[in-house]
């Protein structure tokens, strides 16, 4: 099994992994044979790529870091703005990753325009927890970090859908609106007694840069909470898997 871009998809290819929407329903089933119509439909919904099975990759098995079931639960929780369910999923992500002794990162998830934010948030949670494991954080802290990673973009759900799904560059005014999402996310979470202050600060500060060029507060260096630094790096790294737009951000992290 191997991952290909949607532009490389050809009729007759066999789908290697099922493709889900944000509700957890299957859009394209495992082992379905691609047709021109199906490929066209995938392009229409903004699918960047997919896994296929062929002779070149018949002996390759792609193991996900977290189960499809857990990924679907995370997406559903975020779609429904079910914070309690999201916290449970964040804890489960930490448990699954803690049990995974062989940390070979496979973060290629098949995303459409409508579910990009949700699947991106899952990947940021995974990358953040892996980073936390690498620097020796204890499990209770990892769970708080996982929650911050999973919820870091929850403020975007207050923004217009056409802004979130815009394919081209944002205008100055649109970018100004987009930058409000970290504050909106914090406002949504700040009164929730089930969410730690560490998690809330991770969400609030995840676009701060060590040189002071970030937002919303323009903090520098050690003024930025550790969770936010980890999430920012995970955020940019995951974006780079799907778009070059994040490359400029990486130089400022």
Predicted segments with their positions:
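Membrane-cytosol interface segments
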Residues: 1-88
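Acidic/His-rich, divalent-metal-binding segments that scaffold phosphate/diphosphate chemistry
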Residues: 53-179, 184-198
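Histidine/acidic-rich helix-loop-helix segments that form or flank divalent-metal centers
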Residues: 149, 189-192, 196-228
């Amino acid at each position: 099994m191997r991952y290909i871009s949607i532009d490389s998809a050809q009729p007759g290819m066999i789908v290697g992994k099922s493709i889900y929407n944000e509700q957890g329903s299957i859009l394209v089933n495992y082992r379905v044979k691609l047709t021109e119509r199906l490929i066209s439909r995938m392009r229409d919904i903004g699918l960047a790529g997919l896994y296929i099975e062929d002779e070149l990759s018949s002996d390759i098995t792609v193991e996900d870091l977290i189960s499809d079931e857990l990924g679907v639960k995370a997406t559903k929780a975020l779609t429904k703005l079910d914070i309690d369910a999201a916290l449970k999923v964040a804890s489960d992500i930490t448990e699954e990753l803690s049990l995974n002794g062989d940390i070979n990162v496979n973060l290629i998830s098949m995303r459409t325009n409508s579910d990009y934010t949700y699947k991106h948030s899952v990947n940021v949670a995974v990358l953040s927890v892996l980073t936390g494991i690498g620097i020796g954080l204890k499990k209770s802290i990892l769970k708080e970090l996982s929650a911050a990673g999973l919820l870091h973009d929850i403020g975007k759900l207050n923004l217009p859908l056409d802004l979130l799904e815009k394919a081209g560059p944002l205008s100055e005014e649109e970018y100004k609106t987009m930058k409000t999402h970290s504050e909106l996310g914090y406002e949504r979470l700040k009164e929730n007694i089930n969410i730690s202050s560490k998690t809330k600060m991770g969400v609030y500060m995840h676009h701060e840069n060590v040189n002071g060029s970030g937002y919303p507060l323009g903090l520098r260096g050690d003024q930025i909470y550790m969770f936010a630094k980890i999430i920012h790096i995970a955020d940019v790294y995951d974006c780079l898997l799907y778009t070059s737009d994040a490359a400029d951000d990486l130089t400022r992290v």
